[in-house]
Amino acid sequence: MKLFGFRSRRGQTVLGSIDHLYTGSGYRIRYSELQKIHKAAVKGDAAEMERCLARRSGDLDALDKQHRTALHLACASGHVKVVTLLVNRKCQIDIYDKENRTPLIQAVHCQEEACAVILLEHGANPNLKDIYGNTALHYAVYSESTSLAEKLLFHGENIEALDKV
């Protein structure tokens, strides 16, 4: 379930005083701390994303306080149009956030298969590990997503990768 706490024009959040968003996997997002490009990614607003990128192309890989890019947030939220826009603009696909999660790991963790496929087709490395030693395949297995696991293996995921446990 996704909760949204977007601010209205009067400065109040839609859900009262809540200023946190959660994606399907509990990816916590403090909306008030995000830059415009990150807000567009969370909302899935491809038109706003285009405007942000037109203003400053350097924003493509801008990091929030958790070292997440717009691509991380778009993948966690399942916004295929925004993910496609960002990868076509040549953003960094294998960039790590504070938990060493790549956008691919985040897409798989949130069970956003369409986003994961886009990343894989654009060269995302499926063998990178997060701080716990988990790869995207580990998260696909944890969520019992055989379809995602199959796609990861097809794109070269190492079936022998070990986590830190």
From Swiss-Prot:
Protein name in UniProt: Putative ankyrin repeat domain-containing protein 20A5
Segments passing through the bilayer: none
SMART domains the UniProt entry points to: ANK
ANK repeat coordinates: 66-95, 99-128, 132-161
InterPro entries registered for this protein in UniProt: Ankyrin_repeat_domain, Ankyrin_rpt, Ankyrin_rpt-contain_sf
Keywords carried by this UniProt record: ANK repeat, Repeat
Presence of keyword Repeat: yes
A matching Pfam family: Ank
Top-level taxon of the source organism: Eukaryota
Entry keyword Ligase: no
